[in-house]
Amino acid sequence: MCGIVGAISAVRLKRNVVPILIEGLKKLEYRGYDSAGLAIQSTNGLIRTIKRVRAVGRVAALESQSEGLTATSGIAHTRWATHGAVNTDNAHPHISERDGLSICVVHNGIIENHEDLRIALQA
């Protein structure tokens, strides 16, 4: 079963949310999953970067891959495949970048109105 975790640090605290996201994913492990991932946004002055780390298998592998990353906000996801292969391409989060803008999405299940959403977001 899929699970979603999100974290945002108060601006004045600038707390690293990566350990919070990983801990949240660990608490979801009992539900079962085949892949896990996280996307984080780091803010340095006016420069914002989004980084994505995805892994097939255990959250421990994701934790190892995310060592040293810091961020003030992020989302994380565990996936239990009902459609599509179990691989890093299908692991969440999904990121799309266009014209200097980024959007990061995690979801549970099938997005039935994906074409309508795509058209609205591209407008």
Regions found by a protein language model. Name each.
Residues 1-123:
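N-terminal glutamine amidotransferase
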